[in-house]
């Protein structure tokens, strides 16, 4: 059996990416960046905005991420646990 650490950050961003949910990212300097999450890793979030403009945002500069609609992490977490128990 494999033990995995629950990482809400990754669940949230991955769900927003897969479901193509628009997000507004508020940076610590007050700037807002709006768009779709195209990818992320431990250090950055790649956002595609209007007119396919790409923004690479360092996570240490992020204050808040607000999704355009509710992201249900409960079902995602249950699915991951079910897959890990097989």
From Swiss-Prot:
GO terms for cellular component: cytosol. GO terms for biological process: regulation of DNA-templated transcription; regulation of RNA stability; regulation of translation, ncRNA-mediated. PROSITE patterns: SM. The keyword RNA-binding applies. Disulfide bonds: none annotated. Residues 10-71 form the Sm domain. Keywords: RNA-binding, Stress response. It comes from the Bacteria. Pfam families: Hfq. GO terms for molecular function: RNA binding. Gene3D superfamilies: 2.30.30.100. PANTHER family: RNA-BINDING PROTEIN HFQ (PTHR34772:SF1). NCBIfam families: Hfq, PRK00395.1. HAMAP family: Hfq. Belongs to the Hfq family. RNA chaperone that binds small regulatory RNA (sRNAs) and mRNAs to facilitate mRNA translational regulation in response to envelope stress, environmental stress and changes in metabolite concentrations. Also binds with high specificity to tRNAs. Homohexamer. This is RNA-binding protein Hfq.
């Amino acid at each position: 059996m494999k033990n995995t650490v629950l990482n809400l950050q990754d669940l949230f961003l991955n769900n927003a990416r897969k479901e193509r949910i628009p997000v507004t990212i508020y940076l610590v300097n007050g700037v807002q960046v709006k768009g779709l999450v195209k990818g992320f890793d431990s250090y950055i979030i790649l956002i595609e905005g209007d007119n396919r403009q790409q923004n690479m945002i360092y996570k240490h500069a992020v204050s808040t991420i607000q999704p355009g609609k509710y992201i249900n992490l409960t079902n995602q977490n249950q699915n991951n646990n079910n897959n890990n128990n097989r």
